[in-house]
């Protein structure tokens, strides 16, 4: 009975800690192997002044995999960093994780030792909590952990870095974290990451990763000269590794220098053969080459053979991506679009449906999948009714993203064409009413709704 009571007390204390076991890190179980690879790469390649957090996250992921000995080893590496760098506040997450891990291993005495270490630091900094310290350093640690665990965590990660920056506005690491997570969320045309990236580069002038992200954002804005300068600086850096090269490859692919992008990706894959993201980027390169062939004026007889060959290469790369990251929904979508290009319609439809079946889709991704699946149905399967259904489902996801606006445009175009061609006239006119309502143009919306009602009356006098 006493042992259970001790266990209950230890658990009560553990729940007060700020560490990876208590932060609500959202990711799918299927993502854990790829997450482990990405964390290992970040520890190895990404020039972070303090890799302590990545060792801690690696330990947590290994714990989730049931690899308790390996998890303990990662925490020992983190503890070694604490001792060598004389860290105090930032040691709290490590010691908290150690306490949790020993608890799960059944070592209550060991767990209590680490709880005592946390308590000592909390007392040192006059925390009102016995096992918890509110400080910028811990906000930063939590922010990095959330950032690394994927899109479902980005808003919370941004809040953590913003909170830390209120305390130290010029801190280089806090600005790095804030800029990176802003970039990851900057998927619309409001460019929320541009100034944070500029500031982070100013505070971290030797960081090639930040430079390549800034280059990509400048490319979005059409600032090509400045973007190219940052890319050249990033690639010439002595610390430039595969984590930087993959983003540089994205820059060159978007610049239509696909051969250069493929060269960089192959170079990065030699260092990181288990990176799902690198395979995905290669797939996008082959997909872009297919589009270039389709729009080329050069009508060579072998062009269709080239399309088939490129399609198979793209599909292979997306399949490799999904072996490593089984829940990466956009790999399914891009593979489906390539399959549609070579008339593999059944396979394409299955992959679109797999992408939509992911229950953890963030809003703008869900909207984008509905848009691209709808286009497939409209233009490849000639099924406008089903396409309209998908556009409407996407618009029900209410976040006003870039994808949401493209859905609205797609619905407007198909409705206008159907009205002109007198196809399902009442329904099509009503759809135009909905389009204008969603645009906020109430007067136009009312016009089309009333027109639809009049058409209904003409077609069905008994109504």
Swiss-Prot record:
MRNA binds at residue 144. SUPFAM superfamilies: TPR-like (SSF48452). RNA binds at residues 250, 281, 325. Pfam families: TPR_16 (PF13432), TPR_8 (PF13181). It comes from the Eukaryota. Its main location: cytoplasm. Belongs to the IFIT family. This is Antiviral innate immune response effector IFIT1. It comes from Mus musculus (Mouse). The gene is Ifit1.
């Amino acid at each position: 009975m006493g042992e259970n009571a001790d266990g209950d007390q230890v658990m009560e204390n553990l729940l007060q800690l700020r560490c990876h076991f208590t932060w609500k890190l959202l990711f799918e179980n299927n993502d854990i192997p790829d997450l482990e690879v990405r964390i290992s790469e970040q520890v190895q390649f990404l020039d972070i002044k303090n890799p302590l957090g990545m060792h801690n996250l690696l330990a947590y992921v290994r714990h989730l995999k049931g690899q308790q000995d390996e998890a303990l080893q990662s925490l020992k590496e983190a503890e070694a960093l604490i001792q060598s760098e004389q860290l105090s506040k930032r040691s709290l997450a490590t010691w908290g994780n150690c306490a949790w891990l020993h608890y799960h291993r059944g070592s209550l005495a060991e767990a209590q030792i680490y709880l005592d270490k946390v308590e000592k630091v909390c007392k040192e900094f006059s925390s009102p909590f016995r096992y918890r310290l509110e400080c910028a350093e811990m906000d930063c640690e939590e922010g990095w952990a959330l950032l690394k665990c994927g899109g479902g965590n980005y808003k919370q990660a941004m809040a953590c870095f913003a909170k830390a920056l209120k305390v130290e506005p010029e801190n280089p690491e806090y600005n790095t974290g804030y800029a990176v997570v802003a970039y990851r969320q900057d998927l619309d045309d409001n460019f929320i990451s541009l100034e944070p990236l500029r500031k982070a580069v100013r505070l971290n002038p030797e960081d090639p990763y930040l430079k390549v992200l800034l280059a990509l954002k400048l490319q979005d804005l059409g600032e090509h000269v400045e973007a190219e300068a940052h890319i050249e600086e990033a690639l010439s850096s002595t610390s430039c590794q595969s984590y930087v090269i993959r983003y540089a490859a994205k820059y060159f692919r978007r610049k239509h220098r696909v051969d250069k992008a493929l060269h960089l990706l192959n170079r990065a894959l030699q260092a990181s053969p288990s990176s799902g993201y690198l395979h995905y980027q290669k797939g996008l390169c082959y997909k872009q080459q297919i589009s270039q062939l389709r729009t080329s004026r050069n009508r060579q007889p072998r062009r269709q053979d080239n399309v088939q060959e490129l399609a198979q290469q793209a599909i292979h790369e997306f399949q490799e991506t999904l072996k490593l990251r089984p829940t990466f929904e956009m790999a399914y979508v891009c593979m489906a679009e390539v399959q549609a290009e070579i008339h593999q319609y059944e396979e394409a439809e299955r992959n679109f449906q797999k992408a939509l079946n992911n229950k953890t889709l963030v809003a703008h991704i869900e909207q984008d999948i509905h848009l691209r699946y709808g286009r497939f149905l409209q233009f490849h399967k000639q099924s406008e009714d089903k396409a309209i259904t998908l556009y409407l489902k996407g618009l029900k996801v209410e976040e006003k993203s870039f994808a949401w606006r493209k859905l609205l445009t797609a619905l407007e175009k198909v409705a206008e064409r159907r009205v002109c061609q007198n196809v399902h006239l009442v329904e099509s006119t009503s759809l135009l009413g909905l389009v204008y309502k969603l645009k906020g143009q109430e007067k136009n919306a009312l016009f089309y709704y009333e027109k639809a009602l009049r058409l209904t009356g003409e077609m069905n006098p008994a109504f």
